[in-house]
From Swiss-Prot:
It is found in: Cell inner membrane. F-type ATPases have 2 components, F(1) - the catalytic core - and F(0) - the membrane proton channel. F(1) has five subunits: alpha(3), beta(3), gamma(1), delta(1), epsilon(1). F(0) has three main subunits: a(1), b(2) and c(10-14). The alpha and beta chains form an alternating ring which encloses part of the gamma chain. F(1) is attached to F(0) by a central stalk formed by the gamma and epsilon chains, while a peripheral stalk is formed by the delta and b chains. This is ATP synthase subunit b 2. The keyword Membrane applies. GO terms for cellular component: plasma membrane; proton-transporting ATP synthase complex. F(1)F(0) ATP synthase produces ATP from ADP in the presence of a proton or sodium gradient. F-type ATPases consist of two structural domains, F(1) containing the extramembraneous catalytic core and F(0) containing the membrane proton channel, linked together by a central stalk and a peripheral stalk. During catalysis, ATP synthesis in the catalytic domain of F(1) is coupled via a rotary mechanism of the central stalk subunits to proton translocation. Component of the F(0) channel, it forms part of the peripheral stalk, linking F(1) to F(0). The lineage of its organism: Bacteria, Pseudomonadati, Thermodesulfobacteriota, Desulfobacteria, Desulfobacterales. PANTHER family: ATP SYNTHASE SUBUNIT B', CHLOROPLASTIC. It comes from Desulfosudis oleivorans (strain DSM 6200 / JCM 39069 / Hxd3).
Amino acid sequence: MRKNNGIKWWGWVTLSVLVMVAGDGTLAFAQETGGSAGWRPVYDNVMLVINFLILVFLLAKLLKNPLKNFLKTRHDEVAKELERLETERERAANDVADTKKQVAAEGTHILEIRERIIAEGERTKLAIIENAKKESEFLIEAARRRIQGRFQEARQAFRSELIESAMSIVSRRLPQEIGPQDQARQVDLFFTSLDQAQSKFSSARSASR
């Protein structure tokens, strides 16, 4: 292929030389016949056009393949650069999509942790309240029992003192005022009244609680 191109190129160069030689021969012939004054301007213009066309043709032939190769090389380079940029764009888009997915997943995970912490806090709060309630009930019950025990002790002591005082008074006055039967009846009546009063006091205290 290169050999054929070289043959064609040399053929066009030879043709150009022949055209110029023919032009010179024509000019010499015109000078010999005495018509150089009329042929000279026409010859110059024709040769100028022919030389220009030959130059353009030679430049086109000489620069065709290099220019074609240059344009093809630039086209390939631009295509590769566009392909690289497209690949980078797709990679960047994929990275952005992955980042969005990770952010969404992290946000969901954070919400789950937050809800878990809130639920655990609620359970802990309820457990603390329940324990405090049980402890307060236990303390109240213990205090009530201590108060009730002390009240029983105080009531028993008061009753004993009251009985002793009453017996002392009765033992001093009854012999002087009433007989033995009346003394026994008065003592029984006193103890009956005391028991009734104690029963009423206990019932009233139970109702008030």
